[in-house]
């Protein structure tokens, strides 16, 4: 077993994906699983079959808060956070992260892999010809950290519930050490598949949650890092476009589209008013 790296997995209704992943690396690395969906079946299976895995329940206060909580149980020099819907993270690729960390003499803030199934518009990546390439941002789906440096930076900002927490971390981290994409670590990210959705109602509620938090977090990120005045000027056209779409879909009777933009309006307006990211799945 490697005693330099701990693998951190955040599970939210992701039992099968989590089990499939840990079966590939169970006896190779220390593993911490943080579950914020109160998955008792996953807990029972871990306790029965994987005695050396640390399993913890946590109140669902968001992705960043869960990772910060997990980091308090990390007692290795490095740790890797990995979404259950990532394919390609195995012993070989984890050791590549470790090799790069040592090659850089630990002078990095975070390391990330190359995503093979994403387009350049939605996910900016580095020149694949450069193996260790500086990046402004690393995707939160898979990030490799030096534990001490992560702690010194204060971890993730827990004001973010969903989206932009890794962007905020990388922006802060970049002022101290660089973030790097490791292009010979190639993975696939099946975005949105980590949560097992039981029915259409759950699917719709999850989509509402994502719409609300994306716009809330985007405004909060800009306000925090670039100031209130800049953020207001930047987002006022966005707000007006949302209002116009709400008006248009009200007149045309498109209830589904109207609801979508009402959710975006509420998320952005709440963030502009300085309200917390308190949107949750309806019971």
Tell me what each language-model feature is.
Residues 35-43:
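A conserved acidic beta->alpha catalytic loop
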Residues 128-148, 161, 167, 203-206:
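A recurrent flexible, glycine/aromatic-enriched loop bordering the glycosyltransferase active site
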Residues 86-123:
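Conserved donor NDP-sugar-binding/catalytic core segment of glycosyltransferases
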Residues 209, 213-216, 228-283:
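Non-catalytic, C-terminal membrane-associated alpha-helical segments of glycosyltransferases
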Residues 9-27:
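Short, well-formed alpha-helical segments that are part of the catalytic scaffolds
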Residues 79:
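Short aromatic/hydrophobic "clamp" motif used to bind/position activated sugar donors
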Residues 142-145, 149-154, 159-186, 191:
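A short, conserved alpha-helix in the catalytic core of glycosyltransferases
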Residues 58-74:
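Glycine-rich, basic loop-to-helix element that forms the pyrophosphate-binding segment
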């Amino acid at each position: 077993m490697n005693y330099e790296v701990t693998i951190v997995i955040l599970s939210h209704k992701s039992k099968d994906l989590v089990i499939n992943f840990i079966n590939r690396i169970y006896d190779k690395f220390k593993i911490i699983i943080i579950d914020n969906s109160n998955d008792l079946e996953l807990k029972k299976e871990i306790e029965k079959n994987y005695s050396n895995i640390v399993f913890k329940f946590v109140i669902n206060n968001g992705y960043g808060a869960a990772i910060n909580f997990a980091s308090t149980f990390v007692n290795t020099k490095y740790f890797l956070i990995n979404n259950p819907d990532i394919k390609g993270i195995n012993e070989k690729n984890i050791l590549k992260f470790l090799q790069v960390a040592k090659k850089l003499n630990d002078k990095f803030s975070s390391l990330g892999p190359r995503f093979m199934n994403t387009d350049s518009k939605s996910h900016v990546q580095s020149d694949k010809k450069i193996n260790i390439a500086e990046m402004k941002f690393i995707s939160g789906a898979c990030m490799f950290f030096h534990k001490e440096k992560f702690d010194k930076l204060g971890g993730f900002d827990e004001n973010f519930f969903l989206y932009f927490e890794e962007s905020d971390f990388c922006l802060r981290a970049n002022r101290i050490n660089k973030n790097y994409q490791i292009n010979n670590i190639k993975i696939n990210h099946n975005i949105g598949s980590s949560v097992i959705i039981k029915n259409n109602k759950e699917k719709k509620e999850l989509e509402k949650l994502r719409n609300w938090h994306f716009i809330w977090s985007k405004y909060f990120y800009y306000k925090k890092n670039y100031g209130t005045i800049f953020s207001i000027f930047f987002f006022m056209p966005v707000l007006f476009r949302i209002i116009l779409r709400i008006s248009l879909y009200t007149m045309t009777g498109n209830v589904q589209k109207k609801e979508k933009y009402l959710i975006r309006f509420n998320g952005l307006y709440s963030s502009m008013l300085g309200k917390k990211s308190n949107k949750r799945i309806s019971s």
